[in-house]
Amino acid sequence: MAPSKQYSEGGQLQLMDAERIEEEEECFESIDKLISQGINSGDVKKLQDAGIYTCNGLMMHTKKSLTGIKGLSEAKVDKICEAAEKLLSQGFITGSDLLIKRKSVVRITTGSQALDKLLGGGIETLCITEAFGEFRSGKTQLAHTLCVSAQLPIHMHGGNGKVAYIDTEGTFRPERIVPIAERFGMDANAVLDNIIYARAYTYEHQYNLLLGLAAKMAEEPFRLLIVDSVIALFRVDFSGRGELAERQQKLAQMLSRLTKIAEEFNVAVYITNQVIADPGGGMFITDLKKPAGGHVLAHAATIRLMLRKGKGEQRVCKIFDAPNLPEGEAVFQVTSGGIMDAKD
């Protein structure tokens, strides 16, 4: 594994020491460890070619999907799964053990103390955080700020890792990263080097990018995956009620993949979503809009944030749904340096 980059408080890049690298690697079991359990190296290579690079990721696949990999028979798949189970603990654990496991969650600062407080410390790893709202509500601006803050050291409320950005609308601007990096006292070129970017043009392309991402995350310490926006290409590639069922099925597969990436590699997944008209919202509701994606997206996102425009450059974030956060709102501001606390 190549040495990874880390920032000091002054923004200078440092090489992570061996102990820190070892901690990163302990987040998951490499698929190569199956060889020590008697699995043929050729079969391990077939798994890697199919986008499976960790034992954790392997156990997130059904045996039906694994037997679909060329060269893997049902008997081989059974043997591979048995070997993976020996390396992992996939059964029941106590609530106390789960609480200890939850201590591995990293919370990445949004750049605004008020917004961080609302979110319980920032954007969480191990889950999907969805932000939805109209255009200019701050969704993409928050994404740009997170690209930088995710690379801050842990003690500075960052994620100390790299960022993967999948852009479906062509709104990512590398020049926007420069002033945000300068605000945090970081080297802009180094920050940009730690962001891998891909422009997706179809929903299939978007899904294939996620499959290829596993190889990179298995080799280097990533802490954040951004998809901006998760629904745009599905709304283009599937039209009309006749294709709605297929669209939702494909969307569910995409979201399942995002969930697995979050849990497999301990990364935060931040997705943006569009809004649509809600004709059944009621006569007393003035803003008849709801997030796109229906129940499929609603159930997949762990934390749902509703963003709306405020006064001037101010934006308002409301907790729309979260398992561990109370309802509430926070006001923040979009500046040249990214997301900050609102100024009166």
Curated annotation (Swiss-Prot):
Tissue occurrence: Expressed in meiotic young panicles.
Binding site for ssDNA: 235, 238, 241, 247, 315
GO molecular function, one term: double-stranded DNA binding
Biological process terms in GO annotation: chromosome organization involved in meiotic cell cycle; DNA recombinase assembly; DNA strand invasion; mitotic recombination; reciprocal meiotic recombination; synaptonemal complex assembly
Keywords: ATP-binding, Cell cycle, DNA-binding, Meiosis, Nucleotide-binding, Nucleus
Positions bound to ATP: 133-140
Top-level taxon in the UniProt lineage: Eukaryota
Keyword Cytoplasm attached: no
Location of this chain's protein in the cell: Nucleus
GO cellular component: condensed nuclear chromosome; nucleus
Residues annotated to bind dsDNA: 235, 241, 247
Coiled coil ranges: none
Role this protein plays: Recombinase that may participate in meiotic recombination, specifically in homologous strand assimilation, which is required for the resolution of meiotic double-strand breaks. Exhibits DNA-dependent ATPase activity when bound to single-stranded DNA (ssDNA). Mediates renaturation of homologous complementary strands as well as assimilation of single strands into homologous supercoiled duplexes leading to D-loop formation. Binds circular single-stranded DNA (ssDNA) and circular double-stranded DNA (dsDNA) in vitro. Catalyzes DNA homologous renaturation and DNA strand exchange.
Family stated for the protein in its record: Belongs to the RecA family. DMC1 subfamily.
Protein name: Meiotic recombination protein DMC1 homolog A
Lineage of the species this protein comes from: Eukaryota, Viridiplantae, Streptophyta, Embryophyta, Tracheophyta
